[in-house]
């Protein structure tokens, strides 16, 4: 019980609300794309939170003698696959009865979901996330889980490298390395973008979206020092006001952002990821998380 209570204390108050807010954005985008054309940006918050949690959880496990690569993979599989398989089966069952023509020929797609490469599968299929077609896959939104699974696959090696860097140099060096990954990942989308080409490659690509996971990691790495620094220098009302302003801007983006506009891929997506990371950090510093 004591360890469970300690794990709960590691969570930021309001984190579940942020996750729900991100999911709501994506759902609203799919249900009412005309009213919420920017709801797809909710994926950024989802990925930032995942990067944050995976770093914090791994550090906690390491400090308590519970971290091992095999154990990490086992925990991820237990967390991901049961609900994922149930969802896949439930959706297919509903479609088989209500829309059998849509349910047909989904074997390759389901395999890509279970195998963790659905984003690459969708790129190869030229499956535009922003197209509104009657035959659009009901599993289109699962591309983000594929990026998470790929990140988890390489996580033990990345975590090991960061620990070695910290041990032989400093925590500052480890943070700098992650910040470099954030910047390179964020710039990648702008570099690859071509105005005359379909944006699906950029939207689904692991190389163009993984920066959000690195952002979450970076926030987890600097969180303790930032809290100590900011709380001594800024009044609580000011911190909460910044948090509220960030949430307002994020909400506004759900209403006005357009997924196929050039500005999204020329820094807009990256800027939104940074906004998500700052909101997460501000909630951990201030008290607004208690209200969410």
Q: Can you annotate each of these PLM segments?
A:
Residues 4-292:
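Membrane-interface helix/loop caps of multi-pass membrane proteins
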């Amino acid at each position: 019980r004591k360890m469970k209570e300690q794990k709960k204390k590691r969570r930021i108050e309001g984190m579940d609300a942020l996750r729900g807010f991100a999911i709501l954005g994506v759902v609203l985008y799919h249900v009412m794309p005309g009213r919420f054309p920017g709801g797809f940006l909710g994926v950024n918050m989802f990925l930032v939170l995942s990067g944050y949690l995976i770093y914090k959880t791994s550090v906690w496990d390491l400090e308590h003698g519970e971290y091992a690569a095999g154990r990490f993979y086992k925990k991820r599989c237990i967390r991901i696959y049961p609900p994922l398989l149930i969802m896949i089966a439930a959706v297919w069952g509903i479609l088989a009865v209500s829309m059998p023509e849509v349910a047909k020929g989904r074997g390759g797609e389901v395999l890509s979901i279970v195998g963790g490469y659905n984003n690459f599968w969708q790129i190869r299929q030229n499956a535009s996330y922003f197209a509104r077609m009657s035959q659009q896959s009901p599993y289109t939104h699962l591309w983000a889980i594929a990026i998470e699974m790929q990140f988890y696959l390489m996580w033990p090696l990345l975590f090991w490298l960061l620990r070695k860097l910290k041990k032989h140099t400093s925590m500052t060096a480890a943070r700098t390395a992650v910040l470099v990954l954030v910047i390179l990942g964020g710039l990648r989308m702008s570099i690859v973008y071509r105005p005359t080409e379909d944006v699906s490659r950029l939207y689904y690509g692991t190389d163009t979206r993984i920066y959000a996971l690195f952002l979450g990691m970076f926030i987890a790495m600097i969180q303790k020092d930032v809290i100590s620094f900011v709380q001594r220098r800024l009044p609580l009302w000011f911190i909460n006001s910044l948090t509220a302003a960030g949430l307002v801007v994020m909400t506004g983006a759900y209403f006005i952002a357009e997924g196929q506009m050039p500005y999204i891929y020329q820094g807009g997506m990256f800027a939104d990821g940074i906004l998500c990371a700052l909101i997460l950090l501000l909630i951990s510093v201030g008290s607004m998380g208690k209200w969410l």
